[in-house]
Structure formats: structure tokens, C-alpha cells
Design a protein with these regions (language model features):
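Di-metal (Zn2+ and/or Mg2+/Mn2+) metal-binding site signature of metallo-dependent hydrolases
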Residues: 166-188, 630, 634-635
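Glycine-rich, histidine-containing beta strand-loop boundary motifs that form or position
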Residues: 106-108, 115-116, 181-183, 191, ...
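Flexible loop/turn segments at secondary-structure boundaries
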Residues: 95-96, 101, 113, 120-121, ...
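Active-site microenvironment of metallo-dependent hydrolases
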Residues: 1-144, 189, 194-195, 384-402, ...
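Divalent-metal coordination cores built from histidine and acidic residues
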Residues: 2-75, 130-169, 185-270, 275-278, ...
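Buried hydrophobic positions in well-ordered alpha/beta secondary-structure cores of metabolic enzymes
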Residues: 91, 109, 165, 176, ...
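Residue-level marker for buried hydrophobic side chains located in beta-strands
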Residues: 159, 171-173, 285, 403
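Active-site core of metal-dependent hydrolases
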Residues: 257-471, 486, 528
Length: 669
């Protein structure tokens, strides 16, 4: 393939190049059967500017001895060059920071490098200043240092995963999981989720209703139960008490934060007490507020967030309110800069069936009696299609920052990723391109009109807006933003160097629906695999199955238990020997919990995280009001979608979708 600046007679046609190596710069890829398309902003693995050394594995391909594979051993050479353990070749990375094609190197279970894999004995590295860079128009929209491209070595110790023609995302972070049954973990992995945060002890009434693992004894037992599963774990303790000692002992036992839930009590006094401990211990508070308004209204809860002039950060679960929270105006909290708002997936997006299924779900989850009028009035107060419609819009504006599942307690753990992209599709279909994507397209139009189109990295055939910014906004909702909210963004949540290689590969036609492979800590843990007795890997039944990273002792090495700062060292297993006066060992003790999975402290700056830190989802509406009689929602400062669509200050229309993508085309049931 040649560049416009260096035409050649042996030019490889774009379609042929995509067939051989996957799409490259300026090519577009449709996400499953949605209306969303992403466009590759830069190709660091080859493409128009550096074609000829693309790394491909297979018969007659490049990654072979004396060709693309170096002879350098894993320990490195005299020049300090050390081959990676695994290379993912030519993958289309979709992350909050961009849409690029690159080779990805993994070493010691972490992302070592993003850029160009090569053999230094036969290939020249790409100079740092010659890597193609995304062409951005928005102020501050730049690559983080940990996503900058570089060259890295493939050697005899390197495994190869073909990412060519496939999409690579970070593993999902689900912050609202009721730990009801072990099968949930398999469903999560099969959907591309690699970190689960929540609480529960099994199908007890307290766990089916609330995301809480209460007290030291239960916390220890649940950690023991989850030790052999290849997912990162964060447990939420019971925050519904004004007793600081009861809260602190749960932090010492290993919780990542607290859940205050109305079924246990969500009074202003409880919220204040829990936040005080959160501030002291540097953990997060997740809130399911008082739907019945028994102990106060929304203003009472909002006031409890503030102490000594500081607006303390709070992670609000299902901020729309159907999952719980002050009726009918819980959604107004998206206006607060200290509120980190999230949705749960049963209301995403608003369809003709959404309202109907919620009543039965609520009766089961919250232990209600359908024969008691007061119980049914409680259920009805939470189900408001008007606020669900506003939730659609607020997600597209970037005013609701996160998505989660509410697994088996009104939500589906295997559908968090899928519901996110269904929402994005609905909004694209309804309102057109985002203003940010329109802005990029406008720059291209100017370049074309002024005769610069041929020199511009995007030519006339791609002047129609892509959906890159919208896609980056939505992928951030279940990756980097929940990781930031719970202080684990230094380890997971994005495709950046230094982080755990918790990665998901997707075939574009199955994007967001059925993953191709899931890497957990650099090891393949889940994948689409056919009949184990077949002669090859693809014969039916072709299903998501656990592979070696999910078996034996592998999960103990490729996954973490996240705990509060300073707690990991107390819980990690250490062997202590007791000797007598003659130096003879008389006793061997194990300190900590004696578990094999490593406990890791979360970051210490978690209490300073605000909505302004939410990647591409930091929008604070000028105003948002819910009419207490009609439940209609009015949003000020609404700037989503096509610039010709005016919603600022207008009542949000109730728009029920009758058909969504990623549905019956992919599933029998």
C-alpha cells in the first residue's frame, strides 16, 4: 500500500489490504448491526505510511525465525531489548482516548507496549516522530502518555493472537453486582466483563435486594468463594449504620467501599456517617437513596453530601430512579459536580417492554407482596417512563457517566456492554451525529473545499461524520469511568501501558454481543471455542467457554482483590515461622486470610474524584427539573445530537423504541 505522497504502480487496493491485514487509516467499521461506525484515526502497525512490515502469523506469513521473529531470549539482549510474552497483531483499539490500529505487547500480565511489533535484526523501528497520530479538532482531546505508540520486540518466547480485522477494548468494569450465584462470573466473562464490584452472600433476601456483603465474617467467606475465579473483585460493605466502628471493621476486613441502601436505611444521618468513614479511609460510597422519602426528600440527601463546606463525592447507583432513589426526582442529582452518576441496564434503552417488566422485577427483588396495596404503590412510584426517556438523553450528552448491571437484582450481568451500545444506537438514530463528530467532519469539509483535501489525512470520500466521539464516550461508561470512581484506574479500565492486560477481542459483526476472546492478566481466560472433540476449534456448538486462564491456579495469578489503601498488606498471605531458643522451627503460621489471589490497594486520591474526572462524560446540565405531578423532565443545556435538533429547555419526549439492534439477529431467546 502506498501513501498519497508516494504513489506507486504496485499499489495494494484498500479492500485487498483490509483482507490481508485488517482495516487501516480512514477505513470505517460498523459496530455489530447498529447505526454506529468508527473510523480508524491512525495505523501504528503499518498502513499507508509504513506498509510492508505488518506482523502476521501463519503458514508463509511474517512472524517466523529470521523474518518477523527475533532470536532475542525473554531475559533480553545486551541492548536491554526484551521480547513481549504475547503480541496482539493489528487490532483496532477502541478506547476512551481514541480509535487506532496497533500491535499490542503484553509482558508479565500487563500491557507493555502499544504501537509496532518488529524484529530488530531484520526491520527498522518506526521513529517516534513518524508514527501517524489522530487528527483531532477539539481542545484538550489528546492521547495520554500511556497510550503513545512505540516499537517492541517479538521473540522466541512470544505467543501471537491475531487482532487483524478485530476490535480490541478494555475489559468491562461492572460496579453493581449482587453476588447471588457463581454462574454470574461466567456470564460476566462471556460478555467481556473482567472486574466485578458489588456485594452479597448468595440468594439471601439481603443480597437479592442490596449490593452488600455485611460484616467481617461474610466478607472473608465471599473472598474465599471467589478466590478461584478469573475476575478482579471489589466487595461493598454495609454502609447503613451511624456506628463508625462497624464501618471501619468492614474496611479492615477488605471492602473496597460501602453501599448505603434504603432497604437497610438511607437516612441523612447514615449517609453523613458513611461518608465520614469514606473520607478517612479513602474509599467510595455507593448510594441507593430513599424512594419513599421517609427520612427526607432529595434536598435532604443532597445536603448530607456536604460537610464543612466540602461537597463529598458519591457514586449514585441507577440515578434515573427505577432501580431505587427519591421518587420522582432522583435524576436531578446529575446536576451536582460531586455526584458520580450511573445507570443500571434494565432501563437501557427505553423500549416498549421496559416499563412492563419492571413491576415483577421489583416485587421479587425488594421482597414485596403484590396483595398489599402499599407495597404495590412503592413499586409504581419508581417506574416512570418520563425519567427513563431523559436517561437516554443524559447518557448521550455525557451527563450520566457510567453503566452497570444490577446483576440478578433487576439487571442482567451479561448485558451491560450490549445495553450500552443499544443506547448509543438509539440516540444516533434519533438525533444524528454528536456535535463533536460533526465538528470533525466540518474540518474535513473545509479542507476539501479549499483544495487541501488531497493533502489532508481524510479525503472527500470520508467527509460524512463518523461516530468516533460517541463510541469513545459510550465505551468509557463501562471501562475507565467506573475504574476511576473506585480508585482502580491505575490497574484496569483502559488499553494503556502499565495496566493489567484485561482485554477483549471482538469480531466487528459480533461487537458488544459475543466476544471473540477475553484476556485476563495477559492470559486467555474465555473464548469462543467449538466442540472439544472436534478436529479443529470451530465446529458447533461454538460457544463462549472457559479456557486455561480460568482454570487451575491461573486465576490466582491473573486477577486481583481490590481493597482500601493500607489494607492489602494485612490480608495477603505471608508465612511466619516460630523458632525455639536453639533455632529450631516449632510452628509455621500463615498471616492474612491465607488466600492465593493477591490483595491490592486502591489509589489514595479517590475522595478527590469528581464528575469533572469522568472521561468524556463530565457534562453538568445547566438545569434539570422533574415535575412532581406529571413526572415530565425538562433539561437545560441539552446539546446532544444533530445541531439542528433543539432540546435545550424543552420537555424530554417519551420515546419508546420498538426494535433494537444486537437482539434477535444474534439470539434465539
Amino acid at each position: 500500500m502506498s501513501s498519497p505522497e508516494n504513489p506507486a504502480s504496485n499499489v495494494l487496493k484498500r479492500a485487498e489490504y483490509a483482507t490481508l491485514y485488517g482495516p487501516t487509516t480512514k477505513d470505517r467499521v460498523r459496530l455489530a448491526d447498529t447505526a454506529l461506525t468508527v473510523e480508524i484515526e491512525a495505523d501504528w502497525s503499518g498502513g499507508p505510511k509504513h506498509s510492508g512490515n505488518e506482523m502476521i502469523f501463519g503458514g508463509g506469513k511474517v512472524i517466523r525465525e529470521s523474518m518477523g521473529m527475533s532470536h532475542i531470549p525473554r531475559r533480553g539482549d545486551a541492548g536491554g531489548r526484551m521480547p513481549v510474552d504475547t503480541v496482539i497483531t493489528g487490532a483496532l483499539i477502541l478506547d476512551w482516548w481514541g480509535v487506532v490500529k496497533a500491535d499490542v505487547g503484553i509482558r508479565d500480565g500487563k500491557i507493555e507496549a502499544i504501537g509496532k511489533a518488529y524484529n530488530p535484526e531484520t526491520m527498522n523501528p518506526i521513529p517516534a516522530d513518524e508514527f501517524e497520530m489522530p487528527d483531532r479538532t477539539l481542545p484538550g482531546d489528546t492521547l495520554p502518555q500511556t497510550a503513545k505508540p512505540t516499537n517492541f520486540v517479538v521473540g522466541p518466547s512470544t505467543e501471537v493472537i491475531s487482532g487483524n480485522g478485530r476490535i480490541l477494548t478494555a475489559g468491562g468494569v461492572d460496579t453493581h453486582v449482587h453476588f447471588i450465584c457463581p454462574e454470574q462470573i461466567h456470564e460476566a466473562l462471556a460478555s467481556g466483563v473482567t472486574t466485578v464490584i458489588g456485594g452479597g452472600t448468595g440468594p439471601a433476601e439481603g443480597s437479592t435486594a442490596t449490593t452488600v456483603t455485611p460484616g467481617e465474617w461474610h466478607i472473608t467467606r465471599v473472598f474465599e468463594s471467589l478466590d478461584a475465579y478469573p475476575v478482579n473483585i471489589g466487595l461493598l460493605g454495609k454502609g447503613s449504620t451511624v456506628n463508625a466502628d462497624a464501618l471501619n471493621e468492614q474496611v479492615d476486613a477488605g471492602v473496597i467501599g460501602f453501599k448505603v441502601h434504603e432497604d437497610w436505611g438511607a437516612t441523612p444521618a447514615v449517609i453523613d456517617a458513611a461518608l465520614e468513614v469514606c473520607e478517612n479511609r479513602q474509599v467510595q460510597l455507593a448510594l441507593h437513596a430513599d424512594s419513599l422519602n421517609e427520612s427526607g426528600f432529595l434536598d435532604s440527601t443532597r445536603a448530607a453530601f456536604t460537610k464543612d463546606g466540602k461537597k463529598r463525592s458519591v457514586h449514585i447507583f441507577h440515578v434515573e430512579g427505577a432501580g431505587g432513589g427519591h421518587a420522582p426526582d432522583m435524576i436531578e442529582l446529575v446536576k451536582e459536580p460531586n455526584v458520580l452518576p450511573a445507570s443500571t441496564n434494565p432501563t437501557r434503552p427505553l423500549t416498549v417492554n421496559t416499563v412492563k417488566e419492571h413491576v415483577d422485577m421489583m416485587v421479587v427483588c425488594h421482597h414485596l407482596n403484590p396483595d398489599i396495596p402499599a407495597d404495590m404503590a412503592f413499586a409504581d412510584s419508581r417506574i416512570r417512563p418520563s425519567t427513563m426517556a431523559a436517561e437516554d438523553l443524559l447518557h448521550d450528552m455525557g451527563a450520566i457517566s457510567m453503566m452497570s448491571s444490577d446483576a440478578q437484582a433487576m439487571g442482567r450481568i451479561g448485558e451491560m456492554v450490549m445495553r450500552t451500545w443499544q443506547t448509543a444506537h438509539v440516540m444516533k438514530s434519533r438525533y444524528g451525529p454528536l456535535k463533536e463528530d460533526l465538528a470533525n467532519a466540518k474540518v474535513r469539509t473545509i479542507a476539501d473545499d479549499t483544495g487541501l483535501g488531497s493533502k489532508h489525512s481524510h479525503n472527500a470520500d470520508t467527509l460524512i461524520p463518523n461516530d468516533n466521539y460517541r463510541a469513545r464516550r459510550y465505551v468509557a461508561k463501562y471501562t475507565i469511568n467506573p475504574a476511576l470512581t473506585h480508585g482502580i484506574d491505575g490497574h484496569v479500565g483502559s488499553v494503556e501501558t502499565g495496566k493489567l492486560a484485561d482485554l477483549v477481542l471482538w469480531e466487528p459483526k459480533f461487537f458488544g454481543v459475543k466476544m471473540h476472546m477475553v484476556l485476563k492478566g495477559g492470559q486467555l481466560a474465555y473464548a469462543q471455542v467449538g466442540d472439544a472433540n472436534a478436529s479443529i476449534t470451530t465446529p458447533q456448538p461454538y460457544l463462549p467457554r472457559a479456557v486455561w486462564g480460568a482454570t487451575g491456579r491461573s486465576p490466582l495469578r491473573n486477577s486481583y482483590n481490590f481493597v482500601a489503601p493500607g489494607v492489602a498488606s494485612k490480608l495477603n498471605a505471608t508465612i511466619v515461622t516460630v523458632q525455639d531458643g536453639n533455632g529450631n522451627v516449632t510452628e509455621v503460621k500463615t498471616r492474612g486470610l491465607g488466600l492465593a489471589k493477591q490483595f491490592v490497594d486502591i489509589s489514595t486520591g479517590i475522595r478527590d474524584v469528581t464528575k469533572a474526572d469522568m472521561k468524556l462524560n463530565d457534562m453538568v446540565p445547566d438545569s434539570l427539573h422533574v415535575d412532581h405531578n406529571s413526572f415530565e423532565v425538562t433539561i437545560g443545556g441539552a446539546t446532544t445530537g444533530d445541531a439542528r435538533t433543539e432540546l435545550n429547555g424543552a420537555t424530554v419526549p417519551r420515546a419508546y423504541v420498538s426494535e433494537v439492534p444486537m437482539g434477535q439477529r444474534y439470539f434465539l431467546f
